[in-house]
From Swiss-Prot:
Belongs to the bacterial HORMA family. HORMA2 subfamily. Pfam families: bacHORMA_2. This is CD-NTase-associated protein 7. Interacts individually with CdnD and Cap8 (also called HORMA3); forms CdnD:Cap7:Cap8 (also called CdnD:HORMA2:HORMA3) complexes with stoichiometries of 1:1:1 and 2:1:1. It comes from Pseudomonas aeruginosa. The keyword ATP-binding does not apply. Sensor protein of a CBASS antivirus system. CBASS (cyclic oligonucleotide-based antiphage signaling system) provides immunity against bacteriophage. The CD-NTase protein synthesizes cyclic nucleotides in response to infection; these serve as specific second messenger signals. The signals activate a diverse range of effectors, leading to bacterial cell death and thus abortive phage infection. A type III-C(AAA) CBASS system.
Length: 166
């Protein structure tokens, strides 16, 4: 039984990792931003998310979109991780339509905007090559719009939301 449960959790981690990254790629593309930087770091992003999901240390995936001239946040997308995994029925889904609707609602971003992927992890998490500590840009004057669950596999889930100006 533990072999089956281990395989299933590994499958959940892979599914959730892949679909979080696909969702972020959609956000970047549909917001009118250049996906080249994101594509160039795909392997590193996959390795970090998969590692920290697997150890239970990943708390949040954050895509900061900022004005490079002022270094101020334009918008921010958060995917909060929910660890409610069970080896039950193996249900899985990704709500791409909900995400596309929210991206459309948030609107196109200035073409000069840049983005940065950040991962919020628990203290004591294992190191992943290419990743280090960082700090977030301020969300002062912004309000978060929650979308709810956008990806789930057997209870391991990502709940998306975005920050907009008040």
């Amino acid at each position: 039984m533990s072999t089956v449960a281990t395989y299933s959790y590994t499958h959940s981690v892979t599914y959730v990792t892949d679909n979080i990254l696909k969702s972020l790629k959609d956000i970047i593309l549909l917001s009118g931003l250049d996906p080249e930087h994101f594509a160039d770091r795909w392997e590193s992003n996959t390795r970090a998310i998969k590692t920290w999901l697997g150890t239970g240390d990943l708390r949040k995936v954050i895509l900061e979109i900022y004005n490079p001239a002022t270094d101020k946040l334009v918008t921010r997308w958060d995917i909060d991780i929910v660890y409610g995994w069970s080896d039950g029925d193996g249900s899985f889904w990704t709500d791409t339509e909900q995400l596309k609707y929210a991206i459309k609602k948030a609107g196109l971003l200035p073409s000069q905007a840049k983005y940065k992927l950040m991962l919020d992890t628990k203290p004591g998490r294992p190191d992943v090559e290419g990743w280090s500590k960082g700090s977030y840009r301020s969300t002062d004057g912004m309000v978060k719009q929650s979308l709810g669950s956008t990806v789930e596999h057997s209870g391991l889930a990502g709940q998306a939301g975005y920050w907009r100006q008040r």
